[in-house]
Amino acid sequence: MIPSVEVKPRDEHAAEDIEHWMHMEKPTAGYQERCYYHKFADANGSAEIYQPKLDTRLHISFDALELDGFVEWKMMGVRDYVLGLECGNCYPDGRDVMRKNGMLKFLKPGESKTYQVRIRIIE
C-alpha cells in the first residue's frame, strides 16, 4: 500500500499498465521492469507491503517533503522478482532530467544534510 495522491509512470512501457501499479503479479517470463513515481499530500510519506505466507508487513515512513522522489520499482520476472520501494531526493532519471524538472538539489561546500527513514517489520 502506497497512500500517494499522484502516480506517474516512468516511461511508455510503465504507462501501458499503470492501472495495476499497486498489484504484485505472478512471475512472468520476459517481464520488463516498470517504475512508478509517487507524490504524497504532505510530509507523511509511507509505503507498506504484506507477505501473506509469513503474515508479515514491511512498513517504511519518511518526510515526503524532504525525500520527494519516491519510486516504486517492479521487476516481476521469473528469475528476477523484485519490488523496490525507494524514497530519495530525486528520481533515477539522471542529473540532466532532474535539472530540467527542477528536482536537482545541491549542497554548498561544507554543507551536510540528514534524512530519516523509519523501517518497521510487523509480525
Residue spans for each PLM region:
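Active-site/ligand-binding surface loops and adjacent short beta/alpha elements
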Residues: 1-59
